């Protein structure tokens, strides 16, 4: 099976992130779930409610037991969160692990803007998820978040 076009799908996620309503207390993120070269679900920050994350929104569109998730790649413009400020919601890394998604592709790692020391990548890797980072697309993903102090 050929390697998927990571740049194509990450650019699709970046386009989705532009749909996120910009708010001062949250990142604008896009996410795409892909199986066998086909998009099966998408999401973006605050798509369905003010607290929903992009990965959460995409996963909520599928049955959590959908067998395709075990073959899926999740493209997210930002490292999936390992901790939520909204304590009543599962972190996105936990949702990815529960779904059995084997590959996560990100454009940039979460800075310490809202949560100190996000360990999403490390948590996923510790559980056998292959994480692919595309630093060459980080600037494009970050540009959508210029409303935040990313220093």
Q: What is each model feature region?
A:
Residues 22, 26, 67-68:
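Secondary-structure boundary/capping residues
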Residues 121, 144-151:
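Short, surface-exposed amphipathic charged segments that create phosphate/polyanion-binding patches used
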Residues 28-37:
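Short beta-strand scaffold segments in enzyme catalytic cores
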Residues 2-24:
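Short, basic/aromatic recognition patches
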Residues 25-29, 52:
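Short, basic and Ser/Thr-rich N-terminal targeting/leader segments
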Residues 41-141:
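Zn2+-dependent cytidine deaminase-like catalytic core
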């Amino acid at each position: 099976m050929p390697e998927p076009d990571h740049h194509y799908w990450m650019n699709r996620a970046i386009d989705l992130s532009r749909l996120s309503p910009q708010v001062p207390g949250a990142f604008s993120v896009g996410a795409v779930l892909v199986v066998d070269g086909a998009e099966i679900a998408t999401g973006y920050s605050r798509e369905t409610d003010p607290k929903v994350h992009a990965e959460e929104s995409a996963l909520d569109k599928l049955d959590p037991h959908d067998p395709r998730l075990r073959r899926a790649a999740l493209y997210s413009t930002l490292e999936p969160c390992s901790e939520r400020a909204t304590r009543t919601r599962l972190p996105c890394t936990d949702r990815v692990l529960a779904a059995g998604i084997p590959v996560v592709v990100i454009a940039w790692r979460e800075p310490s803007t809202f949560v100190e020391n996000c360990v999403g990548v490390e948590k996923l890797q510790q559980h056998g998820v292959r994480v692919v980072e595309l630093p060459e697309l980080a600037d494009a993903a970050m540009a959508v978040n210029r409303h935040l102090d990313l220093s």
